[in-house]
Amino acid sequence: MRLSQFWLVTKKESPAEAEVISHQLMLRAGMIRQTAVGIYSWLPLGLRVLNKVSAIIREEMDRAGALEVVMPAAQPAELWQESGRWHAYGPELQRFIDRHQRDYCIGPTHEEVVTDLVRRDLSSYKQLPVNLYQIQTKFRDEIRPRFGVMRGREFVMKDGYSFDLDVAGMKNSYQKMYDAYCRIFDRLGLNYRPVIADNGAIGGTGSHEFHVLAETGEDSIAFSNASDYAANIEKAEALPPTKPRPAPSLEMEKRATPDCKTIAQLVERYQLPIEKTLKTLLVEGADGGIVALVLRGDHELNTIKAEQLPEVAKPFSLAEESKVRGLMGAGFGSLGPVGLKALSVPVIVDHSAAICADFVVGANEDGYHYFNVNWERDAEITRTADIRNVVEGDPSPDGQGTLLIRRGIEVGHVFQLGEKYSKAMNLTVPLEDGTLCTPLMGCYGIGVTRVIAAAIEQNHDENGIIWSKELAPFSVAILPINADKSEAVRDAAEALYQKFLQAGVDVVLDDRNRRAGVMFADIDLIGIPARIVISDKTLATGSVEFKRRNEQETFHISLEEIVAQFCAEEKH
């Protein structure tokens, strides 16, 4: 490709609206342009990268036995009503009415459509298993689109769906996709972690998320420093402490704490170790009453875990303040477990809080706290449970090492759906003995556009993007210095360009006749992995100047040997 014939529209300054580095660099490099809030056009440079990612995905899907299809973006409401998601999905689902007054949506995902597609032609168990996938533009009306294509409203996604006759088959299909996703992200050169995850709105029985580690990630993930264990912080188990609870050493006393409505204020005012404070949260109970959840002041409630408790109402919600005040006689900042047994309020205590002694809690009276409280003597535990988020340094749930907590960008998610959609949509197939079987499904997604942003978040410097060779829009750039003034430079650059083309290399020639500084800045900004500089000075020694984007050192290599040497290195 000749840059004089390419739509390269770079910018020196970062646009004010770009919050994260990937958004800044994608705009500056001329990869994307915003069309509307959360909606972007992909320019030629960006599309080349998008196509590189899609090609790797297709290769690994084909290798794993998945079959590519294309399903419609517009989906009839009837299918979503069959699954029960038409009303459950919420305002993120973009709905519209056609000229015949029929309801449709723009698909954010395709479980319903693919289930309908398969049930139309599935007549024998011999047709299964089957795994269908597509790479398609989706739309989700995010309430707060941000970070460019990382959380846009319109995005490109690879979504796949498997159908199997039994649990063993479903798990086998799931493992194939899990392995394929690992190969994809390995090939893309990403520093990522597959983590145990919650199924969320998709439903099903088991799932893993694939997270690219980056400080700008919106999710927290926990992983062992000594094993492959990794989990979304929502799913990571906090193991019960092994040490016993200390014996009480002080008598409980009630103190006025008029200026202490938060744990932080209490700790600062009385110079307390924060782990000596307990917080009590009152939540809606499954029976219509109230349930108390108690955890250490330095720990955060995990609402996903709390919602799984049989005593707690689904969906999880804090009790209304008026209800709390009517029962307890105090507001949220002054609650504690003392006296709750007499009010028939179940007290579920996190394992870490259950081994505390001589701790501080709210006194169920505004402006007062109890100090030196102890379990059994002063307050009763209904039962203990894991209801908190893990923290860095906690023991790994697999017994190997301790946990690290890092931010992650979710770029992939695989689910074992089971019968969730096939049963709801009456998908059945006759078995050999004539009995009807409801196939078990899996679904598998990769955010293709998000992968690109995540790769930039991990691979950049002050000069721009640093692409891996698998993702780069071009493999090597030829930069002829003062080509408009030197016929020798111009001819040598053209000859070298043709040799690279003949060798099948994705090469770009900067023939725009710009100043050397402009050429260097643009090539660094757009992240080309290697650059070759040709000048009268290098030609005088029969060489070119060669530099890798991710290295500081430059090398002088023979003009006659550079193509062969470059191609040999690219194979390794």
Swiss-Prot record:
GO BP field:
prolyl-tRNA aminoacylation
List the PROSITE patterns hit by this protein, alphabetically.
Answer: AA_TRNA_LIGASE_II
Reaction equations catalysed: tRNA(Pro) + L-proline + ATP = L-prolyl-tRNA(Pro) + AMP + diphosphate
Cited Gene3D superfamilies: Anticodon-binding domain (3.40.50.800), Bira Bifunctional Protein, Domain 2 (3.30.930.10)
What CDD domains does the entry give? ProRS-INS, ProRS_anticodon_short, ProRS_core_prok
Enzyme Commission code(s) on record = 6.1.1.15
Entry GO CC: cytosol
Q: Mainly resides where? A: cytoplasm
Q: Name one GO molecular function term.
A: aminoacyl-tRNA deacylase activity
Can you say where in the cell this protein is located? Answer: Cytoplasm
Q: Which family does it belong to?
A: Belongs to the class-II aminoacyl-tRNA synthetase family. ProS type 1 subfamily.
> What is this protein's function?
Catalyzes the attachment of proline to tRNA(Pro) in a two-step reaction: proline is first activated by ATP to form Pro-AMP and then transferred to the acceptor end of tRNA(Pro). As ProRS can inadvertently accommodate and process non-cognate amino acids such as alanine and cysteine, to avoid such errors it has two additional distinct editing activities against alanine. One activity is designated as 'pretransfer' editing and involves the tRNA(Pro)-independent hydrolysis of activated Ala-AMP.
**Subunit composition?**
Homodimer.
| Record remark on domains | Consists of three domains: the N-terminal catalytic domain, the editing domain and the C-terminal anticodon-binding domain.
Q: What is this protein called?
A: Proline--tRNA ligase
Q: Which source organism? A: Dichelobacter nodosus (strain VCS1703A)
